[in-house]
């Protein structure tokens, strides 16, 4: 009997041990989760539905954010969770939370701020990405000389957003490259209105106006381009050409010299500066510039011959 009593006692002790150990082995209220949901401007979002699904057991949990955007959940078991944040008018955001270590005591975990973007913002961002890709593709087509292909790609962008300055600028460039200044000018003009400090648009507008026989407007555009980008030698050179053509030689000469200060080896600017000095009867200075221009035109036999003849005549004038 003692033996049986001992066996029962032992069995009872084992069962008691199992029952005593069970809470520790079955601990499941292990994590205290808290965090906050905000919009891209960091304003709190109320009423965001947060759902969690344990990947191993498929158990689900849910909660909602309060007025201040905060959420909390006490007693989350350990596991790997698929998490979804949902609110009307906002794009669904998904995440994965990994709480794989069992905890004997509740572990507090602060989730970094969760940002929900509105569906409108997501759509706008996607449109911007599409436009950026189209503009990049159009720029490459322009470099390849496929101006019609560039215009076709840009049309879709401008149909959706007629005020896209990048698309407008490239469309203007493509039209100008096709010899269509009348089509290009309004596009460059609109770019100058949308992005007033973008010097290339003012310069290209000046080119269009010059080709359209609007010298006064072209001079204004080149002047603005020089103000915004004083390091571009083409703006003063083009303005100088217009003034020279208007017989305003004294006004043109400083612009050619300004262009040469930025690009000293430009034979075209050297030639025009020389011509200005001819008009001023400063033949020695004219010869100096024309000799430099001739060296720059070394591969153009016809131009070299023309300058040689001109220089010879000027030297004869100097001797008189």
What are these regions (language model features)?
Residues 127-166, 170-183:
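Alpha-helical segment of the N-proximal tetratricopeptide repeat
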Residues 88-111:
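Structured interaction patches on ligand/partner-binding surfaces of diverse proteins
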Residues 55-70:
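Short, acidic Ser/Thr/Gly-rich low-complexity loop/linker segments typical of extracellular
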Residues 34-45, 142-143:
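Structural motif
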Residues 69, 79-89:
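A short, solvent-exposed beta-strand micro-motif common in secreted/extracellular proteins
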Residues 170, 204, 238, 272, ...:
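Canonical tetratricopeptide repeat
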């Amino acid at each position: 009997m003692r033996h049986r009593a001992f066996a029962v006692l032992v069995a009872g002790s084992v069962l008691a041990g199992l029952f005593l150990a069970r809470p520790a082995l079955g601990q499941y209220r292990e994590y205290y989760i808290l965090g906050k949901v905000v919009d891209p401007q960091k304003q709190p979002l109320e009423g965001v539905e947060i759902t969690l699904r344990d990947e191993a057991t498929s158990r689900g949990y849910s909660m909602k954010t309060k007025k201040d955007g905060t959420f909390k959940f006490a007693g989350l078991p350990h596991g790997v969770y698929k998490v979804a944040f949902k609110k009307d008018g906002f794009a669904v955001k998904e995440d994965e939370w990994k709480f794989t270590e069992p905890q004997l005591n509740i572990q507090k975990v602060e989730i970094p701020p969760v940002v929900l973007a509105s569906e409108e913002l997501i759509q706008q961002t996607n449109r911007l990405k599409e436009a950026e890709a189209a503009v990049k593709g159009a720029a490459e087509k322009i470099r390849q000389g496929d101006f019609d292909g560039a215009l076709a790609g840009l049309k879709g962008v401008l149909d959706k957003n007629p005020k896209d300055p990048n698309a407008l600028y490239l469309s203007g460039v493509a039209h100008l490259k096709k010899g269509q200044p009348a089509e290009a000018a309004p596009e460059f003009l609109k770019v100058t209105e949308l992005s007033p400090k973008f010097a290339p648009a003012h310069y290209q507008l000046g080119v269009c106006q010059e080709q359209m026989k609007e010298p006064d407007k072209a001079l204004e555009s080149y002047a603005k381009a020089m103000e915004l980008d004083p390091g571009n030698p083409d703006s003063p050179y083009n303005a100088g050409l217009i003034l020279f053509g208007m017989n305003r030689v004294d006004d043109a000469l400083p612009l050619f010299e300004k262009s040469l200060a930025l690009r000293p080896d430009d034979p075209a600017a050297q030639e025009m500066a020389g011509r200005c000095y001819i008009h001023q009867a400063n033949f020695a200075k004219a010869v100096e510039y024309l000799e430099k221009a001739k060296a720059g035109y070394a591969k153009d036999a016809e131009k070299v011959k023309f300058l040689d003849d001109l220089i010879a005549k000027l030297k004869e004038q100097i001797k008189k």
